């Protein structure tokens, strides 16, 4: 099958002659209309031809005149033109940035004062160390620094303000120095002078540390890093017998370089190192005598060194010798034998190796080789922010393995060697040639290789990919050299080579081609050539590549450079500056003009005295004026109108054409400069446009100021024009002394002011007429201008900006759009679709004043022309906006998404209460309860005292009657705190009314987009066929509902619609975040040093004793935290079942608490308990002994540096260490674990923030498939685009907005076979619009990709051919395109060694369907399967009969919903109900699980707040696709043998399988519609009833508890400790009278902190938890039924539940290994349905066997319905499960305004009230949407409502590359497509199916491997597209209690997978 010819065959259209007779003849009216249309077209053509010829004529004329005047001056004019252009732009830049320059100057002059003011913040922290003798009072210097010389530029460590040139800080800190030998005193000045000669200044960031001279300082560590990576640390050489240092000499023989093993770049360094080092004097510090007689050494650590480091690195990031450890002020040459430094050395070494610095570790084997592996993809790994230089050897080695470093050593290796031979290369680094043979071989026995053992807690079967090795070769870019040897080629290549070798011409061409290929620039030029060919925005009919190249280059430069420059304020102001300078030049040159007195002819002026340099200046200005004229003509939409406009005619007159015309009429050969001076006064008229220029560029000026400046400039322009013309006409007048131009300026002022002194009167007629004209003009001018000024000062402004004209390309927006949404829309267009929108016209009823700063920031930072008209509701009436609607490109009708912000803020909501007193004296002591609110009393008629016993017969009717009564009372009283729904509803109605008014005008002309808050009128809008419709509230709650199970989903999707531009601020934010975390740890460390007095510098003899002490400390460390655990063999079966199945991690510090409690419920230990405790202690002792033995072995083998490594291994093997060793009261234990890997954790956070930044660059676009991809399988195309271009192809979209995500079986271009109207487009995630255009312009793809694609398609056809002949013959014509993967069975095998195997098996009988053996085999398999089903059915009938005895009889007419309602009250007849909007109001969490919830095993979802639209949240939570755990598990097992049917019974069997599948689908739908959570709503207020927020359908899963989440007591009552998910909604949580949007956001933030503090409080001490239980659950604590099982049971053996409640077992839900689709909760819930599923299978068989008896089938159906409900009700309350504490629940906060985020993260600057106007405009633009990169939002815990504001910018009318925002619904699993029957058939023919985003675990095999391997695994094995990673990172500096979530979208190919990572994949629906 040739895929290249698909869709290219011509379509033959056949006409039938029978229909020709039916065609009516044309009437006269139709002929007239046709003739008119032809005339209009002809006129249009004539008009276009005329304008084009006129423009061409003007351009040629101006160019001819300009070249004519510049011939005499030569090419120097070009230099002058450049100087003038650049100079004017520089002046304009200074003027535009004047406020910023003023601010910088002010800061520089005020900085000296602030230093003294804040000097206390820069004081160092000191700690004192006891010294042994006076001789040893020196800093210990390591051997690394001893054997290296480094020449430093200046000192940086002590923050000297002069940049290190003056040692002022040294003078304060140290007074003198002492030498080692002669006890010489050396001052800092003398030391500096001595070393100044030997030092060379380099651009390095380095330090001069105390303790040695500059001459003895180290060299660049990067230069010597190859030679000194691992050195032996010799304790014997370090100290003398007299405790003195010896200077080690450098051994040249032992440290030679081998040229074969070391990089050539270090050859120059080798020659330097071969020179002998000279011994120099060592500087020793004098000790300071303490009062106690002991001498102390004081060391300082500056906390604020980090901030200075940040500023320096931000300025100069390419300095190659930057040291992280020195910049962090931590490596201050302290003794490495110190205890504290020893514990931190492991983590420091990881950072040093990670950044390419020298490691401080030393191995005992001096000359061992080290193996390191690098990846071939290291070119894709960018620099991190921590590494600030490029040329670093170790960084190049560790680029791709950044996350693979462990604390044991810097070595690492892959878990598989065979599969990575082609991927990795080995680099050997050594110091000498001892281990290298003559042949270059290496002894592998001596090599040290540390392997990372992967401990997988999952039994995941991984399959081998047969295409994995081919893909790496297929897409890898290799520059292959041409080989002359023919023997190395294949047979086919040999034939081709021999065939071409005989032709000389072909050989020459090949040689030329090889020469071009060798050139580096050739490929780039070739790619650019292709890029410009395919860049044409409009499809061109021409096929000439040269024409297309120039046309594409023209369009690219126009849209990317020229168009952008034309709207830049710098360019516009520069034009104005050149006009002013040009006018000044004329005044200067005109003063040299002479003419005889009383000779008023124009041609009699004498120009001899004019300077000759004036010609150069005038020619330069003339050329600049010509360029300005051409620029305006080029970008004008109506060129004819532009040519004949007033300003254009003035510009045309001032060009050189005027001198050419004057010379043509005046035949005297006069110089061109003559006419330039004569016509020079007209150039002043070009200043008339200054007002519009100032208003568009100088945003900080007020409107009144702009008008005043405009009036002044206009008056000056008229004045100088009139004075100049009068000077040319009347001068000189010697009698009245009017000779110079300035004299006539005086006359002009008198004339324009109509004063008329009479000292001069014009003589000529032209002068008199001109004077009269000016007088009349000025009278009208002054009156009009002053009237305009008065209106601007006293009248409200209704228009802001320039109203677009009829011919302009603009987008019209109607409605009260909030300023923030307008800003988001414009910024989204500018960042994602630059230059796609020319102008925006906004009609709004809101006051225009509120858009002032937003308008200025948009115009200043974008090329978008914006006009805002509004101020009154009548401004957007249909009659007024008719013309604007007709001429627009698209229409957007938007509502006010921030309506509460502008309306509720100014409204007072009154509360009717008897107890509320608003006196000023009593408001502090007054409390308002919920019963005091009149509205709550109305809604909840039945209070606690007056409870009513509800019966089922009266339940439904009385419920509705009470609702109706309460609703009427609400309407009458109109009192409700949460009345935002009415405000939004009113705003939606007004918006809908505007839509109806404009729908009749432009429905068929332009697309309409409608945005509403609620979805009340959704059906009406869909019936009107609106182009785009979005409900903000519905989309918000849909995203929240889908994110409940799929963590971080809303944040992942929103990232696709954002692209932050403030990259510099983001880098600064990441560095600030890192340094804040570092400062917190450093302060803690300094406190410990100040408090500890045992810090001593220990001798080498004392090092041996430290080993034993450390072992004893570790053994004590293990003993401390061990709590009482039951023996594994003695654990009862009930305890195993009731224990929490979620995995516990190292951050659970208090997982097991002691059972002894003081106070009530004290437990006494029985004899059995004591025996168990003794058994556990003995077990723990044995475990500790084994651990200590392992550690001693590691210490003996690897040295003392591996002690921490052995601790790590023991931690991984023994869970007791993590679970029980951390005593919260023991600070030493926390110190040991927190400081161990702290520095490595800092770099890990930094690196992941960088990965997140890279993912933010991706946006979602519409992708037009190139022609070369026709015939590609979607799977091949997605893999190819990601492998080669790092783009994610995730789906396709049709012209009808039908979206299909991950259609694995779709073949690109196959829709043309079925004559589809337009080709499908792709949905792609890529970095920019340019990269998207580059992808759509791909022309050539390698042949291997085509072969790979063909092989994939053939294998899919083979696998599906077996199913095509089983099915009926009716669908035979579609067998080639149907069900590619349905019959493909993937057999998973376990990992054999390090290999991953994937076996694709299909039926062997597919090739021979007529074989009888095959049929017999099928029949035997089918019979076996039926026998198994029948046996299972017999067993289940018995169980069913037993269950039927307990069932009650139900009428046949009752449906399933009625049964669900009836089953509740029959079991709970004595239950008291108080219904609120359809759900029960209960007291606390225990009563909810005891009495209300139907399914007790479901996890808890706590919802804080009750907004008006919460029913939308429950609706989408019920429709959650992620609840389909049953479908995921059983979809592949449904009738696997149904396809193996006998051909004789094919029809009957096929009908049965269809029925069985339909039944399964119905059951799966019912299971999916169920909410998988028990929900508790905690709120103080209840919204008003509006017939939509009725929650009666969710009463089985939802319960209401009245209380405020601001009160911790109410939170505990609602079960905050036991909730798996917590959602804090944006609603009123307090009883304030006013409802401010900002105040509600602040309440959400307060609740978030209260929840976190509650968990911290109970984690500190177990007594705190029990005290809270006694207070919050007093009744349940006394209750016998609960207390006997939990509180008062003394027998531990008989009460397994005590482990859950009393010991406070806390399950960590921060990361679930299988998260929610595979979580234990879903497994438990799905396991409960197993019996029901089997029953249904058996019932379905019975139904099929008894088709003739319809009555029996009906009874079976009814029994099935009853069983499902009865089995749920039979489940008893499992107190064990409901008291499981989720220590780290997933919490989501909903915030309305982004300004409130400042209280969460202080680095976010979102408040602009303290800035002036210009700074406010800049800050608004810079910070708009940039909060999305903050550390809090990365964890997907905060949902900001403003994130949805920019979705309007991603729609097709904006750009043809824009995707519809309806793709969000497809991503979250909601199919909004409505297909007809024909469309469904068409989709089946193309094998189209859509997917959704799901969160799945990543197999442990891929840990520490690149993301690309994981991507290919999911693509080939799971048929899923991986688009993101959910990562957990420990960010706690001093404890291991929690982990932070990182949502990384669109990861890079080389990013390493870490443990516990989960993947966001777009799953494929079968």
UniProtKB/Swiss-Prot annotation:
One of its GO terms (molecular function) is potassium channel activity. One of its GO terms (cellular component) is membrane. One of its GO terms (biological process) is potassium ion transmembrane transport. It catalyses: K(+)(in) = K(+)(out). Residues 143-164, 236-283, 1127-1158, 1405-1459, 1532-1551, 1709-1754 are annotated as: Disordered. SUPFAM superfamilies: Voltage-gated potassium channels (SSF81324). The chain crosses the membrane at residues 77-102, 570-593, 613-635, 642-666, 673-693, 706-729, 766-786. Residues 1138-1147, 1532-1548 have a biased composition (Low complexity). Its main location: membrane. Residues 1421-1433 have a biased composition (Polar residues). It is a multi-pass membrane protein. Residues 236-259, 1127-1137, 1148-1157, 1405-1414, 1434-1451 have a biased composition (Basic and acidic residues). It comes from the Eukaryota. Pfam families: Ion_trans_2, Slo-like_RCK. The keyword Secreted does not apply. Mediates transmembrane potassium transport. This is Potassium channel K1. It comes from Plasmodium falciparum (isolate 3D7).
